């Protein structure tokens, strides 16, 4: 069983989709999640469309970039290899987000008790994601926000109160 998550440089999950069977391809999850059409409706404050950096399995689109592949473009130039190396450090931060969430909220990491379609796994992950975001706001950040040097909003800002 797996989930797809989007984490911003302030360390907060801004999108979570799943679960799907662990045997499903990542492209299936991306298509089913509706994430790309959502991104197409958003414009950044600079007027440019938002773009995510994702796993190579996702491929390229107007809103998604991935590492250069020697299989696709031939031998990588030094610039391409450098881009891949630097961006791989950014992509791993999503894994840090899931690691933090499952570390803080053990109930989402009890795989033997989680039965796909028989237990409320999706609800548990959504609750854990919300709690993790709250925890990061109340704690002044997390490993991801420290890595990027971007503070999360305050708890009050997050709740818009």
Where are the regions that the model predicts?
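Short, well-ordered secondary-structure "scaffold" segments embedded in the functional core
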Residues: 1-161
